[in-house]
């Protein structure tokens, strides 16, 4: 039986979505620079005839695959939005208006109004920042190694909080809020380790991304912010940072179970619906 798959070729990761023999939605993931591994996997799936591809590296991957498969290309955000709406339905959410923050290598932020979407903005701070700073500061360069170390890290000896500045005096804002990411590293002899550094890097990224998302949500009076992206996958520390900051500003954070695969899911759905 001929089959179709969806591929989201991102700056760091390439995600694949397909239906297995039992018609269950299934995912594969590769580093985008491991194109040989991607092609080897595809060759083993002998039933694949059509690929819908999206993402920043879609053109590059398409050139390698076009002789062997029928290729359908889809705009990156259209694919992501189709995937997000599918997951929202599967997880029983009934939300039509929201801010969508996609934390990939960098971060992009969109307003969603029913079936319309507008790009609000973005930042170069994202998953690539986490990995780049992790490599520079600790020489750890694999995401799978960063996550468990982050879980046991603490930011108290590296970040300056509002409470640190006011020193017990009543402050105008919450004492636990960060006044300066990594600020203590330059001012005092701190007792910190690699886990603490990694936790603080994630704190910096999480707070920057959340602050931008909150500004956009407040501007449009939107209550819900959906955070997606592979950077959040199994990354409870980052999710907690984003969640607490979002709730502090009276907005509702939502993390979708397969949010990191939204683009690949959307590409798959686009191709299968078009085919049918």
From Swiss-Prot:
Enzyme class label: transferase
CDD domains linked: ASKHA_NBD_PanK-II_bac
EC number: 2.7.1.33
InterPro entries given in the database record: ATPase_NBD, Type_II_PanK, Type_II_PanK_bac
Top-rank taxon, per record: Bacteria
Reactions catalysed: (R)-pantothenate + ATP = (R)-4'-phosphopantothenate + ADP + H(+)
HAMAP family tied to this protein: Pantothen_kinase_2 (MF_01273)
Family: Belongs to the type II pantothenate kinase family.
NCBIfam families per record: panK_eukar (TIGR00555), PRK13317.1 (NF009842)
Quaternary structure (record): Homodimer.
Gene Ontology molecular functions: ATP binding; pantothenate kinase activity
Pathway: Cofactor biosynthesis; coenzyme A biosynthesis; CoA from (R)-pantothenate: step 1/5
Keywords: ATP-binding, Coenzyme A biosynthesis, Cytoplasm, Kinase, Nucleotide-binding, Transferase
GO cellular component, one term: cytosol
Function: Catalyzes the phosphorylation of pantothenate (Pan), the first step in CoA biosynthesis.
Gene: coaW
Biological processes annotated in GO: coenzyme A biosynthetic process
Compartments reported by the entry: Cytoplasm
Keyword RNA-binding: no
PANTHER family: 4'-PHOSPHOPANTETHEINE PHOSPHATASE (PTHR12280:SF20), PANTOTHENATE KINASE (PTHR12280)
Binding site for ATP: 8-15, 105, 127-131, 143, 230
Name of the featured protein: Type II pantothenate kinase
Subcellular location, principal: cytoplasm
């Amino acid at each position: 039986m001929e089959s179709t798959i969806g591929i989201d070729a991102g700056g760091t990761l390439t995600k694949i979505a397909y239906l297995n023999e039992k018609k269950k939605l299934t995912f594969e993931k590769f580093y985008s620079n491991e194109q040989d591994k991607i092609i080897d996997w595809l060759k083993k799936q002998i039933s694949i005839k059509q690929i819908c591809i999206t993402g920043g590296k879609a053109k590059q991957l398409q050139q390698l695959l076009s002789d062997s498969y029928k290729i359908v290309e889809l705009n990156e955000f259209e694919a992501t939005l189709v995937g997000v709406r599918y997951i929202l339905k599967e997880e029983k959410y009934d939300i039509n208006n929201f801010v969508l923050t996609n934390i990939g290598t960098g971060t992009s932020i969109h307003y969603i109004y029913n079936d319309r979407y507008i790009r609000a903005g973005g930042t170069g701070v994202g998953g690539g920042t986490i990995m780049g700073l992790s490599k520079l500061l600790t020489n750890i360069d694999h995401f799978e190694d960063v996550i468990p170390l982050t879980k046991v890290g603490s930011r108290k000896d590296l970040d300056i909080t509002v409470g640190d500045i006011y020193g017990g005096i009543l402050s105008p804002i919450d004492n636990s809020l960060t006044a300066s990411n990594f600020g203590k590293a330059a001012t005092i002899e701190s007792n910190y380790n690699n886990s603490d550094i990694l936790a603080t890097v994630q704190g910096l990224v999480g707070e920057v991304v959340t602050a931008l998302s909150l500004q956009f949500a407040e501007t449009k009076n939107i209550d819900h912010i959906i955070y997606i992206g592979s950077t959040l996958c199994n990354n409870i520390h980052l999710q907690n940072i984003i969640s607490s900051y979002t709730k502090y500003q009276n907005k509702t954070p939502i993390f979708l179970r397969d949010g990191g695969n939204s683009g690949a899911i959307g590409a798959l759905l686009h191709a299968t619906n078009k085919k049918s």
